[in-house]
Every structure is written in C-alpha cells, then in structure tokens.
Amino acid sequence: MYNYLDFEKPVADLDGKILELKKIFQEKGSLDMSDEIARLEKRSQTALNDIYKKLTPWQKTQVARHPDRPHFMDYSKRLLSDVTPLAGDRKFAEDEAIQAGFARFKGEAVAYIGQEKGHDTQTRLRYNFGSARPEGYRKAVRIMEMADRFGLPLLTFIDTAGAYPGVSAEERGQAEAIAQSTAATLRLKVPVVSVVIGEGGSGGAIAIAAANKVYMLEHAIYSVISPEGAASILWRDPARAKDAAMNMRITAQDLYRLKIIDGIISEPLGGAHRGKEIAIDATGEIISEALKAMVGKDGEVLKQERREKYLQIGRSLA
C-alpha cells in the first residue's frame, strides 16, 4: 500500500476495495473476482490520471515532500558506481545532510554533491532532514575545488527545505558558507549539472545549484522560501501556505516558462515514489545528455556561460 496524500482519497478508496477483493479471493478461491478487480483497477488508474493532470502548486509541494519519494541515496545507488564519499569541511565537523565525493557515472569519473533527507526517523535525524549546516556547504566547496583541479564534471542533486536555521549554524557563519558555496560553483571551469529531485528550498538549494544546466523533476518545487515561510511573512499565518504556494511560481512548469530551469524530467503517474527506478533512470538520461553537450567545451566558456545564465534571469524578469 502507498502512503496516500489527502487529495488522493478517491484513489485510496478504490485501492482499498481492490485489496479487500483480492483478500476474499485468496481466502475463498472458488469465487472468481478477476473481472471486478480489473474494473476497479482501471477506475483507480483513471482517477489517478485525472488528479495528476491538474495538480495545484500546493499539491505538487505535497508530492515533492512525499515520505516515500526517492532521495539522493536512492539516486546514488542506481546512477553512480565506484562511489568514494568524502567527509568533513577541514575546519569544524562533518555534516551528513550533504553527501559528497567522487564516483563514476556511466563509466566516466565525476564529482557529486547531494542533499539527503532520510527515509525514517533514524535516518532523518542523522541527515537533519536534509537541512545542512555551514560545515556541509564548506564540504561542498572542498569537492567543487577538487573537481575543478582534476577536470571532473560536477553533478548536484537538490532536495532540501532550506539550510539549517539554528543558532549554532548562524554562529558558525551559515550565510557566509552559503554565499561561498554559490560563488565557488560559479567559478568552476568544468561542466556542472544540477537536478532538483524534491524540494529546492531557498539559499540552501541555490548554494549547490548554480549550474550550467538545471533540471527539475515534474513534481519538484524550487523557491526562495518555503510556502509556510512565505505565508508567515506575508500574512503572519503559516496555515496560509496553500495561498502562498499558488502565488510563488514554485513548480517546474512555472520555472521552465520563466527560463530559470533548462528542462523538466517526467515522473511516473502518481509521482516518483510510485516508480522510483523509472524516475531515477529518466534523470540519469537527462544528465547524460547534458554532459555530452558540454564535452570539449573550454573551461572559461563554461564558466562564462554559467555566469551569464544567472545574470540573464534577473534581466529577463526585470
């Protein structure tokens, strides 16, 4: 059984009936319920299709946050081989919210940086729900500089509600660490490809997303602040997050129209959590195509194109 979101109730009801019939069929094999089960399965798929054809920005936010959605470690296991993770920022500590190191992608050496949220209570606490501290961003800069030194393409996977806002993080220079990470990305003379696989929240996301090519999964979100945060600022009421999401242009479709991202990666019907391998493989193909298009490009050209890409966003929206 899936973890159904509130707006998926019609599908949940139909799937519940299907399970009941299958259970009866198993207990009383003499009853042939295959036709009824097939009819309900068709209705369930139709209902799911109807719902996902017209998701609101707030509903997409819920899908992007789905507890069963594939996270960075799922992508790493399927897309990367010979993984060699590095730990620590060489200044203070290790931050597991950001996973980073070197690996092979389709046989080619790459550097990678990924934000990991965790799948259960234990791993969510371990990874701090994907909210990195300054040490995580300083570790990311370490990897970026090494990738640049060795001429390795950099792949980044974004999935965070935002950088950790705690007092301890602020004391250790959270804002400076985010700024330095963003600046380091813009200085690189190697191809950089970023994919927003779930949430792309605020500076915590942009710190590793200033890439030559930026893609989003179909139901991912990317914004300067979470809908709850925006609602708290605008209306002093986080309960109005739904209203904020409607006005923030946070969906992949909105951001592609605004030319902030370079492409949208299709998800299986019902979201990436309903077909993890399909979603991850589709992401791998997009990354591969993006890297091939940048093979042989001069490092200074890559750096300048990346810089112009972000300057153009401000100009085009002015």
UniProtKB/Swiss-Prot annotation:
Enzyme Commission code(s) on record: 2.1.3.15
Pfam families registered for this protein in UniProt: ACCA
Alphabetized GO MF terms: acetyl-CoA carboxylase activity; ATP binding; carboxyl- or carbamoyltransferase activity
Reactions listed under catalytic activity: N(6)-carboxybiotinyl-L-lysyl-[protein] + acetyl-CoA = N(6)-biotinyl-L-lysyl-[protein] + malonyl-CoA
Protein's UniProt keywords contain Transport: no
Pathway(s) per entry: Lipid metabolism; malonyl-CoA biosynthesis; malonyl-CoA from acetyl-CoA: step 1/1
Alphabetical list of Gene3D superfamilies matching this protein: 2-enoyl-CoA Hydratase, Chain A, domain 1 (3.90.226.10)
InterPro entries: Acetyl_CoA_COase_a_su, ClpP/crotonase-like_dom_sf, COA_CT_C
Domain of life: Bacteria
Principal subcellular localization: cytoplasm
Assigned keywords, A-Z: ATP-binding, Cytoplasm, Fatty acid biosynthesis, Fatty acid metabolism, Lipid biosynthesis, Lipid metabolism, Nucleotide-binding, Transferase
Class of enzymatic activity (EC top level): transferase
One Gene Ontology biological process: fatty acid biosynthetic process
Residues in CoA carboxyltransferase C-terminal domain copies: 39-297
Protein function: Component of the acetyl coenzyme A carboxylase (ACC) complex. First, biotin carboxylase catalyzes the carboxylation of biotin on its carrier protein (BCCP) and then the CO(2) group is transferred by the carboxyltransferase to acetyl-CoA to form malonyl-CoA.
PANTHER family: ACETYL-COENZYME A CARBOXYLASE CARBOXYL TRANSFERASE SUBUNIT ALPHA (PTHR42853), ACETYL-COENZYME A CARBOXYLASE CARBOXYL TRANSFERASE SUBUNIT ALPHA, CHLOROPLASTIC (PTHR42853:SF3)
Subunit-level organization: Acetyl-CoA carboxylase is a heterohexamer composed of biotin carboxyl carrier protein (AccB), biotin carboxylase (AccC) and two subunits each of ACCase subunit alpha (AccA) and ACCase subunit beta (AccD).
Family to which the UniProt record says this protein belongs: Belongs to the AccA family.
Protein name listed in UniProt: Acetyl-coenzyme A carboxylase carboxyl transferase subunit alpha
Species of origin: Bartonella tribocorum (strain CIP 105476 / IBS 506)
Lineage: Bacteria, Pseudomonadati, Pseudomonadota, Alphaproteobacteria, Hyphomicrobiales
